[in-house]
């Protein structure tokens, strides 16, 4: 395990910030201030120090600062100094060099590198108000949420998902064209694409199964915490095979066979009706003896928080990757005093760096002396003195 913490964070023309710099000293940070002050923007900046679109999931063109009358956002940058174990701090950064650009540049110690290299130094995991509707949204949202948990522990999962999606698009283009024109699709090409889909699909299913089992074990060991226990499940056929211990070759073979037999059906439907892209995450509240979707909003929030904390705990024991950095946006406001105190104790015990936001300073009373307090407002970022 390599400890990792952000020592500093610098923003330039990012969202509401023309310029901002936060020195953390490697400590956890709680950010408080009025709605719209820019607290979540700071968490989003940290989340972009990882591959992907960050915690808001928007296009890169949207995050550049834009003044009235400007058609597109400006070029923007996020940079950080990251301390990993006993090594010297490392400078990482990302941004776009031209306003409205769709691709970002990533730099490590001033050298341009692929975005995947960010995961070698920091792994943000987050919980935001957008995830409050996780149990009400379509299966794709829960699948995307769970895949982020998988990716944090197995970075190759993202590349496998991209490979699967690309092969899926190519296969569907052939099948839809054949369905519309009546001309047969190239069978050899379809077989080759389905072989790729089966390979990537089996890898995805097994990675999801490994992650689910690890998270369930972590959650089961957390019975003494004042957060609800959850039983996790994956509903997809291929994930079920992986959970039951089916070897990779068996999943790959059966998926390839299923795809081949579904060509006509998929072409007529205009979408693939079998594969790991159809799976779903199921969460069951053990004490309430009911699915999470039937629980109160408060219990749903607590279930997801416990899942994120379990994820942080399991990743903190990884041997070959940096510790996660936890981003909790407006989470404390939805917890009662007992759970708020438990959250502070949990974050302290995990010895991981966390960034939390809330409108009221009193929400973080249990973190005072254990984390750095920062007021976010019109005057910028104001660091509080420790009491």
From Swiss-Prot:
Biological process annotations from GO: DNA replication; DNA synthesis involved in DNA repair; double-strand break repair; SOS response
InterPro entries found in the cross-reference section: AAA+_ATPase, DNA-binding_RecF, DNA-binding_RecF_CS, P-loop_NTPase, RecF/RecN/SMC_N, RecF_2
Pfam families according to UniProt: SMC_N
Disulphides: none
Superkingdom classification of source: Bacteria
Entry coiled-coil feature ranges: none
Gene deletion effect: Increased susceptibility to UV light.
Claim: Nucleotide-binding is one of the keywords in the record: yes
Function: The RecF protein is involved in DNA metabolism; it is required for DNA replication and normal SOS inducibility. RecF binds preferentially to single-stranded, linear DNA. It also seems to bind ATP.
Matching NCBIfam families: recf
Protein name as catalogued: DNA replication and repair protein RecF
Species for this entry: Caulobacter vibrioides (strain NA1000 / CB15N)
Organismal lineage: Bacteria, Pseudomonadati, Pseudomonadota, Alphaproteobacteria, Caulobacterales
């Amino acid at each position: 395990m390599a400890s990792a913490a952000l020592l500093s964070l610098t923003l330039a023309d990012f969202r509401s910030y023309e310029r901002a710099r936060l020195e953390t000293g490697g400590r956890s940070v709680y950010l408080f201030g009025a709605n719209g002050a820019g607290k979540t923007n700071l968490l989003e900046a940290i989340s972009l120090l990882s591959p992907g679109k960050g915690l808001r999931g928007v296009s890169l063109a949207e995050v550049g600062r834009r003044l009235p009358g400007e058609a597109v956002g400006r070029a923007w940058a996020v940079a950080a100094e990251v301390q990993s174990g006993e090594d010297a701090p490392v400078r990482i950064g990302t941004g776009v060099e031209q306003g409205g650009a769709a691709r970002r540049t990533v730099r490590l110690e001033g050298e341009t590198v692929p975005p995947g290299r960010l995961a070698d130094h920091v792994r943000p995991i987050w919980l935001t108000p957008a995830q409050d509707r996780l149990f009400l949204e379509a299966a794709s949202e829960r699948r995307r949420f769970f895949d982020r948990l998988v990716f944090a522990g197995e970075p190759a999962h993202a590349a496998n998902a991209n490979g699967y999606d690309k092969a899926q698009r190519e296969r569907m283009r052939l099948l839809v064209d054949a369905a519309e024109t009546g001309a047969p699709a190239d069978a050899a090409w379809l077989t080759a694409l389905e072989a790729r889909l089966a390979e990537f699909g089996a890898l995805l299913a097994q990675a999801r199964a490994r992650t689910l089992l690890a998270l369930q074990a972590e959650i089961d060991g957390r019975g003494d915490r004042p957060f609800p226990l959850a039983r996790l499940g994956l509903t997809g056929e291929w994930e079920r095979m992986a959970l039951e211990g089916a070897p990779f070759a068996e999943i790959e073979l059966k998926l390839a066979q299923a795809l081949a037999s579904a060509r006509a059906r998929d072409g007529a439907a205009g979408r693939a009706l079998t594969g790991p892209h159809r799976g779903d995450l199921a969460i069951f509240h053990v004490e309430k003896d009911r699915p999470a979707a039937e629980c109160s909003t408060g219990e749903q929030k607590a279930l997801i928080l416990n899942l994120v904390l379990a994820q942080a705990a399991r990743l903190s024991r990884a041997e070959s990757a940096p510790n996660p950095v936890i981003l909790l946006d407006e989470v404390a406001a939805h917890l009662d005093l007992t759970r708020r105190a438990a959250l502070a104790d949990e974050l302290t015990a995990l010895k991981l760096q966390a960034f939390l936001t809330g409108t009221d300073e009193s929400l973080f009373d249990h973190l005072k002396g254990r984390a750095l307090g920062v007021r976010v407002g019109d005057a910028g970022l104001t660091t509080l003195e420790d009491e």
